[in-house]
């Protein structure tokens, strides 16, 4: 069965430098979702967002921009901006679990407000021809939230819905709710992408067997912890390359060089790399 692998957007990690380094060194990812754009009521696209989406910074990559918002006018503003850059799709983040987002009624904190979701999508589809896709969790407090919102989403021509099979208040703790994801499959007509705890080839195979109708798989933290994972899944192998260490060092050095050139000061650079090292360390026993 053919399938696609997608890189889940992770703030502070999967920027264009990471995307390019991973694609050039390892490959395996079909589509990269860019970390979300957040306007905070100001209709200005920050320079960091601009750099991340510039076509010249994403040459040879399939990239989908993402927005996090609870306001239709913000959505339309960003939709117009990314269309000017040549993008045809905008992903709407209803998945972010962090309190600083959810307390503002955004990310997974918006899933239980079906009326607001309906109002935003209705206005966006009336005033823009951009293709809309969704990135969601099962809810914030419980997995019934998404089940209540899916009938609303079914009334719109969404490209797909990528679902991280946790609720927001879990953050990344505890296990994924596979029964909750199955209920989504049974409830919606939309194409669903699975996201959550794909951290090894064995785990991917397990999920494929569990959800045989799913052909699109999104990898988040597992991709940062093990950048070899997508290509190993695609090649259907459990074996790492013989030159694993050399390949990883080249990947690491590419990232370090690029962040050294773009960030100011040793402290800033080391902090950036430290967060990456926290994930990288999971793939090495020593």
Listing of model-derived features with the role each one plays in the protein:
Residues 1-286:
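Flavin-dependent oxidoreductase catalytic cores
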